[in-house]
């Protein structure tokens, strides 16, 4: 691997780390199990694996590395999700880990603009839509105080949570 390619990959690693930091900060702010460091490590690792598969082994099929990244992140995400009584927790955090790997992979292939746009989209989904969801539960629509219309009083309707 040439020194120029190594400098390029180094830049990609820094960019992936910074982009994934934005996603991780949002999860950290919500006091989730996987926060800043986890998201940065996942994105940086996915970027490095992707870049290495392209630059270090140019004749090989780099899609095998990409598919294995996705599989590995699936196991990591499954470890974040937990269930207590009738509620499932941290599905959104698991999904954010998954998309963080995709952001790292995009940057690792040189699709920096796609990585930046994806990060901003994820940030919008996590941050802005969270506030819309919070307001929905803050102002009930059925008059019984829970905002879900089923009368169970927990505000979640089916007893599950996606955060």
Regions found by a protein language model. Name each.
Residues 1-65, 112, 116-117, 127, ...:
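Alpha-helical transmembrane segments and their membrane-interface boundaries
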Residues 59-86:
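Alpha-helical transmembrane-segment detector that highlights a single hydrophobic TM helix
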Residues 120-121, 136-139:
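A small-molecule sensor/coupling module
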Residues 29-34, 82-93:
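Membrane-helix interface "capping/anchor" motifs
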Residues 90-95, 113-118:
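Hydrophobic alpha-helical membrane segments of integral membrane proteins
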Residues 18-23, 75-82, 104:
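Hydrophobic transmembrane alpha-helices of secondary-active transporters
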Residues 73-78, 121-131:
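Alpha-helical transmembrane segments and their membrane-interface exit regions
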Residues 41-51, 73-75, 95-108:
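Small-residue-rich segments of transmembrane alpha-helices in multi-pass membrane proteins
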């Amino acid at each position: 691997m040439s020194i120029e390619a190594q400098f390029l990959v180094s830049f990609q690693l820094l960019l992936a780390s910074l982009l994934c930091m934005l996603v991780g900060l949002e999860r950290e702010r919500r006091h989730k199990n996987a926060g800043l460091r986890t998201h940065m490590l996942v994105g940086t690792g996915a970027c490095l694996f992707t870049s290495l598969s392209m630059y270090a082994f140019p004749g090989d099929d780099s899609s095998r590395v990409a598919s294995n990244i996705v599989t590995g992140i699936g196991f990591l995400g499954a470890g974040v999700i937990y269930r207590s009584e009738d509620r499932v927790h941290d599905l959104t955090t698991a999904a954010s880990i998954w998309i963080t790997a995709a952001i790292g992979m995009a940057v690792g292939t040189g699709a920096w603009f796609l990585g930046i746009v994806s990060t901003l989209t994820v940030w919008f989904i996590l941050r802005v839509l969270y506030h819309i969801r919070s307001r929905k539960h803050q102002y009930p629509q059925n008059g019984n105080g829970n905002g879900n219309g089923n009368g169970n009083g927990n505000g979640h309707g089916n007893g599950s949570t996606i955060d």
